[in-house]
């Protein structure tokens, strides 16, 4: 999960909305993992 997060960070800032969605999905996964 962390490596995927880093990849999203490295991507250009052309789609800030999509980045927000990715962060939300990661937060959900972390919550489920906990």
From Swiss-Prot:
Domain of life per record: Eukaryota
Compositional bias segments (type: Basic and acidic residues): 1-12
Region feature Disordered, mapped onto this chain: 1-21
Protein name (database record): Uncharacterized protein YBR221W-A
Organism of provenance: Saccharomyces cerevisiae (strain ATCC 204508 / S288c) (Baker's yeast)
């Amino acid at each position: 999960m962390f490596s995927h997060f880093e990849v999203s960070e490295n991507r250009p800032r052309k789609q800030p909305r999509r980045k927000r969605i990715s962060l939300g999905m990661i937060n959900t996964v972390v919550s489920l993992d906990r």
